[in-house]
Amino acid sequence: MGKKHTWKRTTAAVMMLGLMTSAAGCSQSAAGKAEETVKQAIEAGKVESTEKDSVIVTMPVTSEPEAGFDPAYGWGAGEHTHEPLIQSTLTTTTTDLKIGKDLATDYSVSEDGLKWTITIRDDVEFTDGKPLTAEDVAFTYNHCRDNSTVSDFTMLKEAVAVNETTVEFHMNHPYSIWPYTMAVVGIVPKHAYDENYGQHPIGSGRYVLKQWDKGQQVIFEANPDYYEEMPEMKKVTVLFMEEDAALAAAMAGVVDVAHTAASYSEQQIDGYGLTAVQTVDNRGFNLPVGEVREKDGITYGNVFTADINVRRAINIGIDREEIIENVLNGYGTPAYSVCDKMPWYHEACEVEYDPGEAVRLLEEAGWREGKDGIRKKQGVRAGFTLMFSSGDSVRQALAEETANQLQEIGIEVKTEGVGWDVAYDRAQSEPLLWGWGAHTPMELYNIYHTAENGNGIGEARYSPYVNETADAYMDEALAASSLEEAYELWKKAQWDGSTGITQDGDIPWIWLCNIEHLYFVRDGLMIGEQKIHPHGHGWSLINNVDLWSWK
């Protein structure tokens, strides 16, 4: 290690106020909050990073797990999936999002896809010294099936411990991507699990929860009895704060990694560099398919976006690179699907920006330019309202940039911030800017497949759309005998040469960009090779924190 990061915390705290209030882009209120958060930690003797084997990281306040560190209630296997750190999982995902093994030494699935058999290691102990067995695995999954509030376990009928090292998963229906579920569900001890587990978790993973000061920080320490190679980082402190406060903390030199946003990307911080991590954290909007109809007080369909030529024109009439430059300061990649770069992604989703062809498609469909530059057809103006979640400045900027671009080809787009209490219903007839991106192909299913319980009209859940051929491919993918076979079927659901969800298919959704996750990282800290991050700017960063090192 060339230089040891042994700065004085108390001196940094004294310097912080001046640094924060002078920092461009940092509001005084945010600066004050950052100062108070870090000063409290310093005074309590909790924030220290003076050794080669410790690190301090900031995360958004929304990353703090409300229900604690319990896999049944969102830890690891929640909306924003990540490795649970405290607990072990049966499988894991590699940097290219293929499946590896953690507790599992072998796994297989029956020919009918209704039984998974997993063999686990026999040398793993929980941090209370008790052995981890198949009983614990079965208990964990059955408990998640019955109680999980954030993850779908409806495919699981029952988990059964056959012996101490063998567990069987009996399924309600074939589910070939079960290994991806096994990669995020942390195993909890049957003997030590109760309603308070999330506050005081016992696991067998790489780290132990040492301290949790709610609303402020969590501290992890390396598990001394971990069954694989000991973590390089023996202590990991996570501070929860907003982006402007995290920036201020980095400027004061009291954190090693600070999450940030594109709006702060031009900040120069002495002793830190800006790191951009590739993601599948995408933004896109739905285009309701089908004519307007109503059911149970909800309007479905849209007279303008029902036209397939309109949807195709919109897809190629948007300059994604310009959006990324204007809204994200260049920190993003064009998105063409909900699963770019994933093993199940079909490259047929990609399109070139072609406003000339977009205009031709609109003209061909009878949408003629009016005196005000907006197209019309049989008295209907070419346009729609593009909604975004209120308070999300990035989605608002994306919506406004999209509106500006589409106006160039004669489409009038109005933007509106809405709350999620009305957004879901309104999205059945109006486009809404969404954020998606997961380490599982099930997201394709959830967005495009006809909803099992219907969405009121027997079509896809989030926006009216039906493609029976694509549905069949996705059903076949879930019933496939191997992940490799399933990957090809997921690709066919996107485009099989004749139909699908791509530009030459039905194009019921438009994808704009994948937002790169940005961090100010202290010089000398090596954060290793990062997996492609899913939706959510939080725990994914420290999936591999055990491999981080100082030089």
Predicted regions and their residues:
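Detector for C-terminal structural segments
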Residues: 213, 217, 315-346, 350, ...
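Ligand/substrate-recognition segments at binding pockets and active sites
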Residues: 368-438, 517
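N-terminal lobe/hinge region of extracytoplasmic solute-binding protein
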Residues: 58-109, 202
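Gly/Pro-rich hinge or "lid" segments in bacterial periplasmic/extracellular proteins
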Residues: 74, 94-98, 174, 180-231, ...
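Periplasmic binding protein-like
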Residues: 57-59, 129, 250-251, 257-260, ...
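Extracellular/periplasmic solute-recognition and catalytic clefts
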Residues: 151, 158-160, 210-221, 237-296, ...
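Alpha-helical secondary-structure segments
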Residues: 133-140, 164-168, 205-206, 234-235, ...
